[in-house]
Structures are given as structure tokens and as C-alpha cells.
A protein has these predicted regions:
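N-terminal beta1-alpha1-beta2 module of alpha/beta enzyme domains
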Residues: 2-93
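An alpha-helical appendage that flanks or caps ligand/catalytic pockets
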Residues: 2-20, 150-190, 223, 232-277
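Flexible, glycine-rich active-site loops centered on histidine and acidic residues
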Residues: 10, 19-43, 104-174, 229
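Acidic (Asp/Glu)-rich catalytic clusters
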Residues: 18-19, 58-59, 83-92, 114, ...
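Hydrophobic faces of well-ordered beta-strands that scaffold small-molecule active sites
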Residues: 24-28, 65-67, 94-98, 125-129, ...
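Active-site mouth loops of central-metabolism enzymes
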Residues: 32-48, 100-108, 195-205, 268
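Acidic-and-aromatic substrate-binding clefts and catalytic sites of carbohydrate-active enzymes
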Residues: 71-78, 102-108, 229-234, 269-271
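A conserved active-site cap/scaffold subdomain adjacent to cofactor or substrate pockets
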Residues: 209-237
Length: 277
């Protein structure tokens, strides 16, 4: 198992109004360190052990295998090759992210990669996206070539890219044909398309407002462990309020399906003396 913190992810399927069919999964950061006691000393160790962990989790009945995505750090960063490998080695367990920082993404290329990973897995991808968590890089996304528009906040940038990604996943025309090559003028959608993927996109939310925004866009909700609107009440109550507002906003939109909601809790497995140290 990759070193470092893991989290359990629990969510309801939302398959029927008023019914909470709960599922449980794991969320791995995939840390690796070449230090005494480490069982994941390299990136290869972390990646391969994450695949093995997902296989083992499926065997014992765990419902989901999720990974964190952080850049410029010794942990998992590029999720789609990993998710595709997990999808090819498993048959039932859901696979996904919590979350992909959209500031670092080309939303159209990401739509291609997401569809490919979903098709490889047989439609098991549960993709969490968001603004991302605090990071060690200063303007890291700009190092990738993604510079926000003048006056655009990091959060607005992530939401704008998410909307482009959603349109592409839903099959919208995002380019035009070249009449000189095709003899026609028309729209082009990203290929491949994976039916049903659009209903399996989640937004990682740390505030009430972004949870309501997610509902307005038809996104499932990944409630963050870093809720930023501290009102003096215990965390579980604050999180419950966020989820209630999300469900209310979802109902007001009149979406045909029921949404899914997930929460996560940190777990430190202690099985040996070395773990205690």
C-alpha cells in the first residue's frame, strides 16, 4: 500500500428519491519517499501499489477506488493512465478522482482522456474535479501554460474550464470542420464519447455557494474536508448543512436524476509496530 494518509470515501448512489444506498471506498494520495520504513520508495512503487490496492479492495467488496491529484509533489499527479490501468485490471469497483485541479487542465483533451478511461473500465469512472487544494507551487498552473484571463480568480478559472469540459463530455460541437478537407461546414465533437459519463462528474466543494453552483450545473457533490465557512458549529454539522443546501438547489433545478454525494474521513491504518512510529 502506498505510504502516507489514506481516506475512506462514503457516498450515496442517489438512485431513488428518499433512498440512500450508501457505498464506501478509499482515497489514496499515493505518497512515495525513499526513506527508512517506506514501502513506496519511488513513483513506480506508488503507481503499481495503487493498482494492486484497487484490485484487493474489489476482492473484499469495497465499492470505490479514488485517487488524489497533486502537482509538483511526490504523490499521484496524472490520473488517467492510472485509472485506465485500474479499469483494465478490475471489473466491478468504481474508479475516480477527488479531485482534479481544473486550473492545470486543457478541458477538451481532458474530455478525450476521461472518455477513454471510462470506456476501458466499462463505464465505472467517477470523476471529481474542482479548484484544487492549497499547493506548494506559486502559480503552478501557469507553469503548465495555462494563464487565467485578466481579473479571473483561480476559482472562476476552474469553474470556466469545468463548463467547457462538461460541454465536451456531453457531445457539444467544440470545433468546426474544414470545408476544404471535408466538403462540408459543421460542428465537431470530441471523440470518443462515453455514454453516461456526464452523469458521473463530481464537484469538490468547500463552501455552501460552490455546492449550490454544482447543483445548478448537474454535478454530483464531493464535500470537502476543508470547508472554509466556519460558523462555530462542529464540522459534521457544517458539512450536513452544505449537503442540505446542495440537495435543495438540485431539487430546484428539476434534474431528472437523483444526485450523488460523498464525504471522506482520514484513516491511519496501524497494523505493525513500524506504523506506530
Amino acid at each position: 500500500m502506498p505510504d502516507g494518509r489514506s481516506e475512506t470515501v462514503s457516498g450515496d448512489t442517489g438512485q431513488a428519491a428518499g433512498v440512500q444506498n450508501k457505498k464506501i471506498g478509499f482515497l489514496s494520495f499515493g505518497f512515495w519517499r525513499d526513506v527508512p520504513g517506506s514501502r513506496a520508495r519511488s513513483a513506480a512503487d506508488s503507481l503499481l501499489q495503487t493498482i494492486e490496492l484497487a484490485q484487493a479492495a474489489e476482492e473484499i467488496g469495497v465499492d470505490g477506488a479514488f485517487v488524489r491529484v497533486h502537482h509538483f509533489e511526490r504523490q499521484l499527479a496524472s490520473p488517467f493512465p492510472l485509472l485506465s490501468a485500474i479499469g483494465a485490471r478490475t471489473s466491478r469497483i468504481e474508479i475516480g478522482t477527488a479531485v482534479i485541479d481544473m486550473r492545470y487542465e486543457n478541458p477538451l483533451y481532458m474530455a478525450e482522456e476521461a472518455a477513454a478511461a471510462d470506456l476501458i473500465s466499462g463505464g465505472r469512472l467517477q470523476l471529481g474535479v474542482s479548484r484544487g487544494s492549497p499547493e506548494i507551487a506559486l502559480r503552478g498552473a501557469e507553469s503548465f501554460g495555462y494563464v487565467p484571463a485578466d481579473g479571473e480568480s483561480a476559482a472562476d478559472n476552474a469553474r470556466r474550464k469545468t463548463e467547457i469540459f462538461l460541454a465536451a463530455v456531453n457531445g457539444a460541437a467544440v470545433a468546426r470542420t474544414d470545408p476544404e478537407r471535408t466538403g462540408i461546414s459543421g460542428g465537431l465533437a470530441i471523440q470518443p464519447q462515453s455514454p453516461g459519463l456526464a452523469d458521473r462528474i463530481w464537484w469538490g466543494s468547500g463552501t455552501r455557494a460552490t455546492a449550490q453552483w454544482a447543483a445548478a450545473k448537474g454535478l454530483n457533490l464531493q464535500s470537502s474536508t476543508l470547508l472554509t465557512e466556519d460558523t462555530g458549529v462542529p464540522f459534521d454539522q457544517l458539512q450536513a448543512e452544505q449537503i442540505r443546501l446542495y440537495r435543495q438547489a438540485w431539487a430546484e433545478q428539476g434534474w431528472a436524476r437523483e444526485p450523488r454525494v460523498s464525504v471522506s474521513r482520514s484513516v491511519l491504518p496501524i497494523t505493525e509496530d513500524i506504523d506506530r512510529r
